[in-house]
Design a protein with these regions (language model features):
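Short, low-complexity disordered leader/linker segments with a strong preference
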Residues: 1-24
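A structural signal for short loop-to-beta-strand junctions that line the ligand-binding cleft
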Residues: 72-77, 95-132
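Short, solvent-exposed loop/turn and secondary-structure capping segments
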Residues: 39-40, 89-91, 130
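Short helix-loop capping/hinge motifs at secondary-structure junctions, enriched
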Residues: 132-139
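Short, glycine/serine-rich, charged loops/turns that create anion-binding
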Residues: 11, 32, 133
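Early extracytoplasmic/lumenal segment of secretory-pathway proteins
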Residues: 16-86
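Residues that line or immediately flank small-molecule/substrate-binding pockets and catalytic motifs
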Residues: 8, 81, 101
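Glycine-rich, phosphate-binding/catalytic loops in enzymes
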Residues: 44-45, 90-97
Length: 139
């Protein structure tokens, strides 16, 4: 949890690098809010920055960002899979982030080649099969 909290803090601070002082931050996310709330609470305690979380369907959130344009309240768009990140990049809703911290800590396979998005986590996928029909060597 601490690594995720640190990385989230870095991303948030970098996303607002143009601001001199940050009092409040808005994250549009398709992740489950209950999974983010402990991280956000830690971030708030560590920095004093209030985080507003707007949760919803990824497609709807991207539409909202498109409609809001430059007036979007979203400082960060956080989603659950790389496919949505690709769609968001294609819609050009991301800005390039230049950060030595992210360059050092996020492997190239977990980020956009143009630094428009960075992966926060990765998941293992399992294959379930009938051992009556297949041998594990078949895979």
């Amino acid at each position: 949890m601490k690594k995720i909290s640190i990385l989230l803090s870095v991303l948030i601070l970098i996303s607002c690098a143009n601001e001199n002082e940050i009092d409040e931050l808005t994250i549009y996310t398709s992740r489950q809010p209950q999974l983010l709330e402990p991280i956000i609470e830690d971030f708030n305690d560590d920095t004093g920055i209030k985080v507003n979380l707007l949760s919803g369907n990824a497609q709807e959130l991207m539409e909202r960002i498109d409609i809001e344009g430059n007036d979007s309240m979203a400082d960060i768009f956080m989603t659950v899979d790389a496919g949505v990140l690709w769609q968001a990049a294609e819609r050009d809703i991301f800005s390039k982030v230049d950060s030595e911290i992210l360059e050092r800590n996020v492997p190239s396979y977990l980020k956009d080649p143009e630094n428009k998005w960075f992966g926060l986590s990765k998941r293992a996928r399992t294959i379930v099969f009938s051992s009556d029909q297949f041998a594990s060597d078949d895979f």
